A protein has these predicted regions:
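A cross-family phosphate/adenosyl-ligand binding-site feature
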Residues: 2-146
Length: 146
């Protein structure tokens, strides 16, 4: 519809979207999502799990967002003293995409053992989990419970 794209730009303009990228084969597709969000004038920050870096490099997301892609919880080159708390406060929306069964289980049970999960658990804004895994894994009752 005419004007629909303009409405989305206004809706996302100035909003901070934090995207957590996990170690699934669909990780490479998130570069397109980040690019689309940037075109809609959103501020995008990306956090990756260590396993995600096996599928796509942090440099890709840094090029698309113009900001540092966070991977290591203990990186000493952060902008803020407690980076995961600062980023959680900045977020208007937090999305984990693709979300592996492993990361879904971690956040469902309150485990925070990396930059992505600690930031996700600290964030008080709307959160979205976008599962991406083999159908048998997704349909497993344990995954469904999580």
């Amino acid at each position: 519809m005419p004007g629909e794209s303009a409405g989305r730009k206004i809706m996302l303009q100035g909003k901070t979207v934090v995207i957590g990228v996990t170690g699934g084969i669909a990780a490479y597709k998130i570069a397109s999502l980040v690019s689309m969000l940037k075109k809609q004038h959103a501020n995008v920050r990306v956090i990756m799990t260590e396993n995600a870096t096996n599928f796509i490099t942090p440099v890709t997301f840094e090029s698309l967002t113009g900001t540092k892609c966070l991977v290591d919880t203990f990186d000493r080159n952060f902008e803020f003293q407690v980076e995961h708390i600062s980023l959680a406060k900045q977020a208007d929306i937090f999305m984990i995409a693709p979300a592996t069964a492993n990361v879904i289980a971690k956040v469902a049970h309150g485990l925070a053992d990396d930059m992505l999960t600690t930031t996700f658990l600290a964030c008080k804004k709307p959160k979205y989990i976008v599962p991406a895994m083999n159908t048998q894994m997704y349909e497993n009752p344990i995954t469904q419970d999580n």
